[in-house]
Amino acid sequence: MKKEFGKVGVLFGGRSAEREVSLMSGKGVLAALLSKGIDAHPFDPAERSLAELAAEKFDRVFIALHGRFGEDGSLQGALEQLGIPYTGPGVMASAIAMDKVITKRVCLSHGVPTPKFTALEVEATTAEQLQAIAAEFGMPLMLKAPHEGSTIGIAKVETAEGMQAGFDLCAKYDDVVLVEQFVKGRELTVPVLGSGRNARALPIVEIIAPQGNYDYEHKYFSDDTQYLCPAPFDAAFTKRVQALAVSAFNAVGCTGWARVDFLVRESDNEPFLLEINTSPGMTGHSLVPMSAKVAGTAYEDLCVEILRMAKLGLKPVQHK
């Protein structure tokens, strides 16, 4: 496989709030690629300049970075400038999916349902506005920092009196706070591989966390969280959710791979989009490898498949 892929950089670590998770993902991917005979090397953008990728003649990179500066389009843009093919979605799709508010707006326009929401600018929002939203939406509410992942910068607010504290917590991470109607129900995720008409959904994973608290600790370090894969739904519902996942994936322009998260409302079994993750975790607790395994693809083979789809999203201008 050395000839097929050349010199491969595995990008992990980085400068986001999700650095710890990225280190775990990257080490797993690196070991998997090495086990397949691929000339793979670790590369931490927090410690080295991206220009070194070109100087050291890397042929392609596997992005195992999470959060800002890794899956928000900025890294993808730099790699486009360097002319180095990379895994996962391109500049535009990465930037859209990193913003939960824009993702919701785009997916709604393509018929993918999402919980009722609004976006508030931190500097312009008053206490009175928070109370008005609480009255309009009803309680409880989910408040989120739109550009963070791994459950960072999220607050569940049970009462109107708790709005300010929840808002302030999210404001530590972002200039905008997403306010979302709370949906009581089951949490699902659907990995998607491929591009366009060839995009395909993998088996659905249902996440059952203790007391429904799927936070950072339970997501990456706890053995108490249960995962059901394939999720126990009938064939018709499974097909519907997988189709919604592919629709959301294509709506924002994803290519390569991504993970689409949903909530299924308890009262009527209706699915709602939560977010799209364009650089999903690849740790021992991660959901994409879990789903792929059920579909018959081992972790090492999944890493190779993702790497094989690495590409540049922008065609260079041909000057005459």
Swiss-Prot record:
GO MF annotation terms: ATP binding; D-alanine-D-alanine ligase activity; metal ion binding
Domain of life from the UniProt record: Bacteria
Source species: Janthinobacterium sp. (strain Marseille)
Family note: Belongs to the D-alanine--D-alanine ligase family.
Cofactor note: Binds 2 magnesium or manganese ions per subunit.
Catalysed reactions, as listed in the record: 2 D-alanine + ATP = D-alanyl-D-alanine + ADP + phosphate + H(+)
GO process annotations (BP): cell wall organization; peptidoglycan biosynthetic process; regulation of cell shape
Domain annotation ATP-grasp: ranges: 104-308
Binding site for Mg(2+) 1: D261, E275
Chief subcellular location: cytoplasm
InterPro entries, per the entry: ATP-grasp, ATP_grasp_subdomain_1, D-Ala_lig_Van_CS, D_ala_D_ala, Dala_Dala_lig_C, Dala_Dala_lig_N, PreATP-grasp_dom_sf
Chain positions recorded as ATP binding sites: 134-189
Cofactor(s) this protein requires: Mg(2+); Mn(2+)
Keyword Nucleotide-binding part of the UniProt annotation: yes
Compartments where found: Cytoplasm
HAMAP family in the cross-refs: Dala_Dala_lig (MF_00047)
Protein task: Cell wall formation.
Gene Ontology cellular-component annotations: cytosol
Pathway(s) of this molecule: Cell wall biogenesis; peptidoglycan biosynthesis
Enzyme class: ligase
EC number(s) reported in the record: 6.3.2.4
Protein residues bound to Mg(2+) 2: E275, N277
UniProt keyword list: ATP-binding, Cell shape, Cell wall biogenesis/degradation, Cytoplasm, Ligase, Magnesium, Manganese, Metal-binding, Nucleotide-binding, Peptidoglycan synthesis
Name used for this protein in its record: D-alanine--D-alanine ligase
PANTHER family: D-ALANINE--D-ALANINE LIGASE, D-ALANINE--D-ALANINE LIGASE B
